[in-house]
Curated annotation (Swiss-Prot):
Alphabetical list of InterPro entries matching this protein: TANGO2
Similarity comment: family membership: Belongs to the Tango2 family.
Keywords carried by this UniProt record: Cytoplasm, Golgi apparatus, Mitochondrion
Gene name of the record: Tango2
GO process annotations (BP): Golgi organization; protein secretion
Protein name: Transport and Golgi organization protein 2
Transmembrane segments: none
Length: 283
């Protein structure tokens, strides 16, 4: 289970942000993971890396920049769908997208190619964002593979997605999006420190948005435990183990801020990372 909220605007007001993104990664606490960092094999990419045997090198959220633009990829599981026999690992969907800057890996071409081959994976939502010149609107797409669907979303609008189809959101996603919109409206031109603190507070929200018919259908056994933005299901050692905020300001300065568990206890120590990168020379 994961959630993501974002607003992508290629031409924000001075002092505003081209990208405001907040995301929780929900996973088993024991799953081996590298915290957000510049990637060793692609030094223009930033994000966490999955170390699970057989899934090494994949990621759930990453941002990459190149000459003239930057792009973001995020992957969310679609809960409650049957798993294909011999399903291919999904983590490389994001990694392949953000590491390559050629035309074949443009947001349009990459998604159209993925759409033709997406049923070999377990069910997912793939969010892709591409932001370049201020004269061109940000491009935002969401690809779901059950059923195979590719949708476009608008520059400058706030969106929230989770582990259901985009037009059947869980209650926590619906309410979270409303709160995210309020934060963007109130703090969308605030300092990185102020805006990121507000977004982290949203991601830590433990309120259970229950009952939820869609979540009850997709996860009948875990539904109530999964109904908060900040998930913690102690008996299964599962929950929101990583909170991420990614900001790119109007001058193309990127901030990747992450809080992630260092052990198996969500009440224990968390590792805090703040990566700053000036995309100006590349964008």
């Amino acid at each position: 289970m994961c959630v993501i909220f974002f607003c992508a605007d290629s031409n924000p007001q001075p002092g505003g942000y081209k990208l405001i993104l907040a995301s929780n990664r929900d996973e088993f606490f024991a799953r081996a993971t590298l915290s957000a960092a510049k990637w060793a094999n692609a030094d223009h990419v930033y994000g966490g890396i999955d170390l699970e045997p057989g899934r090494e090198g994949g990621t759930w959220l990453a941002i990459g920049h190149s000459a003239g633009f930057f792009k973001v990829g995020a992957l969310l599981n679609l809960t409650g769908e049957p798993k294909p026999r011999d399903a291919v690992g999904r983590g490389m969907i994001v990694a392949d997208y953000v590491t390559r800057a050629d035309e074949e890996h443009s947001i349009l071409n990459y998604n159209e190619r993925l759409l033709k081959d997406c049923t070999k994976y377990s069910a997912f939502n793939f969010v892709s964002i591409e932001i370049g010149s201020a004269s061109q609107p940000a491009r935002v797409k969401l690809l779901s593979n059950v059923p195979p669907t590719l949708e476009d979303f608008q520059n400058g609008e706030c969106y929230g997605f989770g582990n259901s189809l985009p037009h059947s959101p869980f209650e926590k996603v619906r309410h979270g999006k409303q709160e995210f919109e309020a934060i963007v409206k109130a703090h969308g031109e605030a300092s990185v420190e102020t805006l990121s603190a507000q977004l982290m507070q949203l991601l830590r929200n433990k309120h259970k948005f229950w009952p939820d018919d869609e979540l009850k259908t997709r996860a009948p056994n875990w539904g109530e435990g999964l109904s908060s933005l900040n998930v913690h299901i102690e008996e299964h050692a599962y929950g929101s183990r990583t909170h991420s905020v990614v900001l790119v300001d109007s001058e193309n300065k990127m901030h990747f801020i992450e809080e992630t568990m260092t052990g198996l206890d969500p009440h224990g120590e968390w590792n805090k990372t703040h990566i700053e990168k000036d995309f100006q020379n590349g964008v």
